[in-house]
């Protein structure tokens, strides 16, 4: 796989998704990543540390430059726990759990983020305002209600299907209510 091309395509996708989701500084963005799918394999069966490093590095830098927190979802072997900065866990009062991600228990994205973050910790539950799913990893459980699908500029990254979500407040009150 051409890692330079992967880097460029990841940048195009994250820039587009951030524009569409309108996520703001201080908010949380969740990433679900299957490097196996990006590599043309079956999720969880062909993990690549190099692919994870390229993708997470691009997304982490882009979000950090905008003051947006990154949460990286683990694979099912860690119950889809999330790697975040300890500062965010403290700020949101999210319970920290003990585990260090590995390539086949957490995944390549978490391993890369663990190396990039200043003070990485794992938590079981978060509420993100938006997210990017590379490889059909099912990030919906981590995105605030009401979730709205976002169609990224590119539908694939390598061999992986790419989708995204944003959220909006619930509309309540019925026909008498006004929303804007």
Swiss-Prot record:
Pfam families: DUF436. InterPro entries: Antibiotic_NAT-like (IPR028345), DUF436 (IPR006340). It comes from the Bacteria. Belongs to the UPF0340 family. This is UPF0340 protein llmg_0465. It comes from Lactococcus lactis subsp. cremoris (strain MG1363).
